[in-house]
């Protein structure tokens, strides 16, 4: 009677301790996001963790076989071990895609849409151009520049034929 | 896995080989661009200036401009 009383006390203590330890375990255990993650990256060829975290029974057996001599492993087993450790091979992770077509197409579409906006603006928002853009004004302006011999060596006046009074061919 | 054994790839000196090749290409391209610029731009411009000033008569030029009426100080 006394022994069982003592035992139940000890048992209670043991149970409550183990409950505390269990509770403590779930509080102290690291969250998944704070541990190293697996990545397929060219510049990180050997990640800290393997790709497959929870092995099936057959995979566990394979890992045991891996501890023995590797020449006893078949080709398929070697590939299976590789796929446990890594998600994509280098060739797979580096494969090209057709994304560039979407990007270029999308960019061209939006540039075209911008052109429509600008056309609308020219028609409905902007005022008239200054008179210095008129054809007659520009002609008089160019004639004056040629009279002044602006850039006579390689520039504007060098392209004008002063004898024949016309642009050089 | 493929039944035939692939040849062992280059394991070392990859960066050195890349740098060597890029150096060679960069050298050739730089020389080429410099030569092209020298002949097609610089020498052509020097010749244009020399040809212009060889038989240049500044007073004749001034008279033409004066007759065209661009000056305010002299008509």
Curated annotation (Swiss-Prot), chain B:
Keywords: Membrane, Mitochondrion, Mitochondrion inner membrane, Transmembrane, Transmembrane helix. It is found in: Mitochondrion inner membrane. InterPro entries: Cytochrome_c_oxidase_VIc, Cytochrome_c_oxidase_VIc/VIIs, Cytochrome_c_oxidase_VIc_sf. The keyword Membrane applies. One of its GO terms (cellular component) is mitochondrial inner membrane. Component of the cytochrome c oxidase, the last enzyme in the mitochondrial electron transport chain which drives oxidative phosphorylation. The respiratory chain contains 3 multisubunit complexes succinate dehydrogenase (complex II, CII), ubiquinol-cytochrome c oxidoreductase (cytochrome b-c1 complex, complex III, CIII) and cytochrome c oxidase (complex IV, CIV), that cooperate to transfer electrons derived from NADH and succinate to molecular oxygen, creating an electrochemical gradient over the inner membrane that drives transmembrane transport and the ATP synthase. This is Cytochrome c oxidase subunit 6C. The gene is COX6C.
